[in-house]
Amino acid sequence: ATPSPPTLYGLCSCEQPNTDGSLAYGCLAMDYIPQITSVSWKKDNEPITTGLKTYPSVLNKKGTYTQSSQLTITESEVGSSKIYCEVRRGESVWIKEIPDCKGDKVHPTVILTQSSSEEITSRRFATVLCSIIDFHPESITVSWLKDGQHMESGFVTSPTCGVNGTFSATSRLTVPAREWFTNKVYTCQVSHQGVTQSRNITGSQVPCSCNDPVIKLLPPSIEQVLLEATVTLTCVVSNAPYGVNVSWTQEQKSLKSEIAVQPGEDADSVISTVNISTQAWLSGAEFYCVVNHQDLPTPLRASIHKEEVKDLREPSVSILLSPAEDVSAQRFLSLTCLVRGFFPREIFVKWTVNDKSVNPGNYKNTEVMAENDNSSYFIYSLLSIAAEEWASGASYSCVVGHEAIPLKIINRTVNKSSDSSDHIWIEDNEEESAIDNASTFIILFFLSIFYRAAVTLVKVK
């Protein structure tokens, strides 16, 4: 048979690039005789040695041969280079340029959007989204500028996503609210196949009430300290930016918050609590609430500890019943518990009936007030009860807790059978003088003047 050269065809997959960005090129040699020696590939003038698959030659019915070879290569590897298929037989060489599998160039549409002023103020940061839509080929470069200067951080660009033969991507810029409201210009710059597009957006000129976070630490309740093995410390952070992190430490040791960060009463506040042992609190150890956020140059810290009290004063407890005519004539009567002469001011007062806790809605405690010499404090509590309950012989106790009390708790109990013709019961410390007893009696006497009005208020409530 007479030798004949191969006819070469360059092939390109009609499918768009795979999700990994790879392309498939084909080289088909037909109608040649005798068989060819080799099929190879080049990118410009550089040999390609990977991604190749050459199939065995096939003898056709008319006595000639056909052979094919496939090249798989990524779009980024091809770039702007040209791909060639080279066929050899002895000293003869045939070369075929393969069509561009990347398709036509399509430059992207670039759109900038921003979060609303209300969202920026509440979250304490602005979000600018640069949407890069419908481009081909896949390779792009995205950068951000602030007032014309390149930014090195504060933005994240997503991987490209291919749909229907084109690609899309997004780049998200985050700007602290304090900086956003200074009228700076931010630019999203997109480069694609030698063409650069820029889109600008200007921060708002509206002033922002973006004050620094403020930390307020709350100690445990005195009732917790006196009655429980663990106590709760509370950290309230106002003016808190969105995504703020609150943690606790004791000296250099991190503490685990028992309750995660949660919204406070205000939209821009968060609350974090931690449980510690009562013994640790009473020891005077220092506990820190640490507030951290990307907008803060350094974390904010505030500390709390139990202050040492040297001049402890134990309270005296006195109880007054409504006047006798009220007991007989009214459906409701009142008991008043006066607690005085104590220091420091932290104290709790509550009531029980027959050793069961009374609903706090049935009694009213006043604020703790300083006595005349300002060296001690007093408080009183007014309990409203039904006359028939009192007549049944129920026992009512005023329960007082204070750190100066040896057993931490004082119970003062009265009932219908208590022996007191003037309806006043007084329990005093042994150190109390006759003058103290007299002052207590006088205070209770004046309180009794207002009992009818006080009981009425409690009933209305």
From Swiss-Prot:
It is found in: Cell membrane. Coiled coil: none annotated. InterPro entries: Ig-like_dom, Ig-like_dom_sf, Ig-like_fold, Ig/MHC_CS, Ig_C1-set, Immune_Resp_Modulators. It is a single-pass membrane protein. Residues 100-205 are annotated as: CH2. Residues 309-418 are annotated as: CH4. Residues 1-99 are annotated as: CH1. Residues 206-308 are annotated as: CH3. Gene3D superfamilies: Immunoglobulins. The keyword Protein transport does not apply. It comes from Heterodontus francisci (Horn shark). One of its GO terms (cellular component) is plasma membrane. It holds the Pfam family C1-set. This is Ig heavy chain C region, membrane-bound form.
